[in-house]
Amino acid sequence: MNFIRSVGAKTLGFIQSLGSITLFLLNILAKSGTAFVRPRLSVRQVYFAGVLSVLIVAVSGLFVGMVLGLQGYTQLSKFKSADILGYMVAASLLRELGPVLAAILFASSAGGAMTSEIGLMKTTEQLEAMNVMAVNPVARVVAPRFWAGVFSMPLLASIFNVAGIYGAYLVGVTWLGLDSGIFWSQMQNNITIHYDVINGLIKSAAFGVAVTLIAVHQGFHCVPTSEGILRASTRTVVSSALTILAIDFVLTAWMFTD
């Protein structure tokens, strides 16, 4: 009986959380005028959410590409198919690994920072002070961060992809001796803009919406204590990672299956 009660409580809690975050998203969309009328607010957040994440995304992409190049060359060589290494790495990064890994890195760095920042503003009653001054905190604080994250995520995924392909090139061509022309020509002949590049960007944009929405929602509704901010930041990273993987499965089934 206790098990059934526990499952029921968790199910109701999940439905309530889903409803809360949906209403919060609608509120952000309704209050987004300030983010576009005063673009300085969003541009500043693009710097904090996007530009400051470029280094970790680029370095991670480089090493992921190097690993893919090494593992791919080793396995493909067994079947005399090492020539398709460039295509294999590019397809893996553009369709799957680039958007997913870049989004998880974004969630763990910029997402957690957004939650902590908004949570600190709530703890120090800055959000309440905005309400007293007739300034809507969703329009002033949340919406610019939301749109900055949505805009930054596809760019970060693209940087991850470029760094990963270059990493595979370093390993496959410079180290293992694969012909440079074959590496690039296989990629050029088999990668398509719509099927590979555009679908990957759509994925990364969807991840950007999900991660940023979770981050600002957790910060805005956290318990206004230091422990509450810590728990909210942890929930942001964990929930974002699970949501990214769930959305990735749905989008992959829609985009890449007949």
Feature-to-residue mapping (PLM):
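Short cytoplasmic-facing helical segments at TM-TM junctions of multi-pass membrane proteins
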Residues: I118-A143, S226-I229
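Start (N-cap) of specific transmembrane helices in multi-pass transporter permeases
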Residues: Q45, N136-A157, A232, T236
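Membrane-interfacial helix-loop-helix connectors in multipass membrane proteins
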Residues: Q71-L94, V162-A205, V209, L213-S233, ...
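Hydrophobic alpha-helical transmembrane segments of integral membrane proteins
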Residues: A139-A148, V237-T257
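Loop-to-helix entry region at the N-terminal start of transmembrane alpha-helices
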Residues: I56, S60, A82-M114, A148-A157, ...
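Membrane-interface helix starts
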Residues: T34-V59, V238-A241
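Short, membrane-interfacial amphipathic segments enriched in basic
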Residues: M1-L41, Q218-V223
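Hydrophobic alpha-helical transmembrane segments that constitute the membrane-spanning cores
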Residues: S60-F63, A102-A110, A143-G172, I214, ...
